[in-house]
């Protein structure tokens, strides 16, 4: 082992110190899974990424860890890693190998060549009905405006639709009950047309910006007629945490069948550092 450099990025925002935090180790060769998990716990962000050489023809392979476990797929780590790698590589498309397959991210630059936006093609999720009473009880509400369903794109997300943004903002879920649902996240949304508010809860708290949920939310709204297939929505998340985030999402399909999912947003790099592990020279 040796000294391992990392980048800290704020994802789904253009403003430093907002959005969702992410640490990216840009060259994780030599680290085993146990050490990666320990580093993710040490950093304490919702996710930490370790970049490795590709194995399936992509630009790079990535392993994603939250403080407790490895994850096959998560949205804000994919977008943030594409920004971190895209700047030095000067590529228009970054293809990241994840546990859920290869995820391409198309990067957009301004007139000065700086990265300003990225769009990822997400895995098409499977959909199944959820136990509505159990889910609503965990969230602390009595009803959902649309059916409560579970979407699985490598991450497992429940979606509940409330009547107003104020109702979303006022939520105080039962986190042990949320944890017992055994999902990546329980998402509550409200809005209309192209603008929606969202909050995502998991067993130990709340997430500031959830890219793996944004695509399923667009799918959910299109499947149930709240928006048109192919219509892009803008999701605002993280407000109640003091980390406002903006996510763009779009789903293509017909009737209730999903054919493609795209999620986009911006990222800003806010810090760089280095971990020196026990046998690294001081």
Predicted regions located by residue number:
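Active-site proximal loop and beta-alpha junction motif in alpha/beta enzyme cores
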Residues: 1-73, 78-282
């Amino acid at each position: 082992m040796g000294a391992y450099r990392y980048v800290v990025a704020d994802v789904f925002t253009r403003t430093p110190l907002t959005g969702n935090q992410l640490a990216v180790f840009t060259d994780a060769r030599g680290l085993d899974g146990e050490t990666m998990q320990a580093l993710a716990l040490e950093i304490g962000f919702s996710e930490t990424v370790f970049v490795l050489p590709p194995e399936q023809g992509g630009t790079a392979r990535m392993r994603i860890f939250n403080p407790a476990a490895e994850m096959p797929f998560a949205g804000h780590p994919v977008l943030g890693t594409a920004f971190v790698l895209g700047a030095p590589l000067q590529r228009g498309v970054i293809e990241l190998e994840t546990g859920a397959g290869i995820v391409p991210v198309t990067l957009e630059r301004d007139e000065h060549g700086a990265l300003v936006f990225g769009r990822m093609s997400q895995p098409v999720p499977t959909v199944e009905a959820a136990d509505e009473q159990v889910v609503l009880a965990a969230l602390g509400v009595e009803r959902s405006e649309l059916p409560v369903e579970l979407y699985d794109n490598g991450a497992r997300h429940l979606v509940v639709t409330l009547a107003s943004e104020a109702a979303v903002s006022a939520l105080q879920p039962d986190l042990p009950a949320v944890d017992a649902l055994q999902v990546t996240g329980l998402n509550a949304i409200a809005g209309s047309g192209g603008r929606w508010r969202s909050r995502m809860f998991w067993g130990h708290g709340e997430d500031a910006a959830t890219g793996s949920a944004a695509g399923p939310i667009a799918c959910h709204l299109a499947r149930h007629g709240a928006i048109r297939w192919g219509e892009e929505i803008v999701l605002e998340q993280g407000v109640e945490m003091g980390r406002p985030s903006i996510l763009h999402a779009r789903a293509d399909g017909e009737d209730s069948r999903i054919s493609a999912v795209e999620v986009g947003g911006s990222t800003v790099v806010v810090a760089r550092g280095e971990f020196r592990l026990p046998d690294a020279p001081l």
